[in-house]
């Protein structure tokens, strides 16, 4: 299982590469392989040129893409995201969501997202509305942005 946080949760004293490689250390992946996999994950989200940047040197959208790469690097079958664009402006949110959709499709992953933003829900193939803890509506999205996100 991969997880993309609302507030990025990047380690401020680690580079983008180190942030992405970090979860692999808990799995006992050797250092060289961790770095190779982290570089590939950053390339997959369009941040190959930012791998040595610290979080404070990157925009919010770039930091969120580091978070996406970190979620993908362990090759999970399912990725959960909690308001993944909540801290971003609308243009950056759209850019990040397009990147996420492309990445999810190219890796064949299931992506489940929680959002209060109907613009972000428009990227989903399936939407489940919940009010006061109860499902109020379920529908399949026909919007052009639909991209394999539930």
Feature names for model-found ranges:
Residues 1-123, 129-130:
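ABC family nucleotide-binding domain
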Residues 126, 134-150:
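Conserved beta-strand-loop-alpha-helix hinge in the C-terminal portion
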């Amino acid at each position: 299982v991969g997880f993309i946080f609302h507030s990025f949760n990047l380690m401020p004293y680690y580079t983008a590469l180190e942030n992405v490689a970090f979860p692999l250390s808990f799995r006992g992946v050797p250092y060289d392989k961790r770095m190779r996999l982290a570089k590939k994950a950053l390339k997959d989200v369009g941040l190959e040129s930012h791998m040595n940047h610290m979080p404070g040197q990157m925009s919010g959208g770039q930091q969120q893409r580091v978070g996406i790469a970190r979620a993908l690097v362990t090759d999970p079958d399912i990725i959960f995201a909690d308001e993944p664009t909540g801290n971003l402006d609308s243009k950056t949110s759209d850019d990040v969501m397009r990147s996420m959709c492309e990445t999810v499709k190219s890796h064949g992953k299931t992506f489940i997202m929680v959002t209060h933003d109907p613009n972000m829900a428009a990227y989903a193939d399936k939407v489940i509305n919940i009010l006061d803890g109860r499902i109020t509506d379920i529908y399949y999205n026909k919007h052009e942005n639909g991209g394999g996100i539930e």
